[in-house]
Amino acid sequence: MLKIRNLYKSFGKVEVLKGVDLDVVEGEILVIVGPSGGGKTTLLRSINCLERCEAGSIVINGKELFKDGHYASKKELTAIRKDIGLVFQGFNLFPHRTVLENIIEAPTRVLGKTKKEATESALEILGFLGLTDKANNYPFELSGGQKQRAAIGRALAMDPKLMCFDEPTSALDPSLTDDVANVIKSLSTQGMAMLIITHDMDFAKKVADRIVSMNNGIILEQHIYEVAEND
């Protein structure tokens, strides 16, 4: 689902990504851990076209997003980005819209679904996430864990092939992380590939098929290991 080769990204004279190689396969949950400033979030943002890289390549679901300083055309980028879901660290839900309205916004505007089609799909997603009774609530009426699940639901509504999570438990009480972990593991059983950035090693061990350590703009291959059990 994701293939990155020799990826470089700089901010001015500061080199943040220094030749990153990374693969994520269908149904895999890959977690990237490492200290702040090591390049994890920049890598995630680069995959989602929120940052532009200078060299290397990014291929998503067999489609070339970026190669050797050149990005796909605007039309191609739009198609590729439909395969990527992103759940932000701060949820980024629209505060003036209900949970249901948050979820149907992108499918109607971007995918061209009718409101009826988008609503039917959204209600299925809310059922899967255990949020059916919160469909008409506004974000301020939700707990942190419920907001995170609603944010996941909004990303799922676009039917992505690769889901990216930026620190999905950082704003949650530790007692709520199991809820998010269970949702993520359920998604992987449906074949969705996931890339997760986190500082929470306990959470990483609960969800990951593979954990990669990243620091100083590079993947530390000697720290890659397979998780034998998801406790």
Report each predicted region and the residues it spans.
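Helix N-cap at the start of a conserved alpha-helix in ABC-type nucleotide-binding domains
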Residues: P174-L176
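Helix-to-loop junction immediately C-terminal to a conserved catalytic motif
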Residues: N48
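ABC ATPase NBD coupling module
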Residues: L65-G85, K115
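H-loop/switch region of ABC-family ATPase nucleotide-binding domains
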Residues: T198-H199
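Catalytic Walker B motif of ABC-type/P-loop ATPase nucleotide-binding domains
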Residues: M163-D166
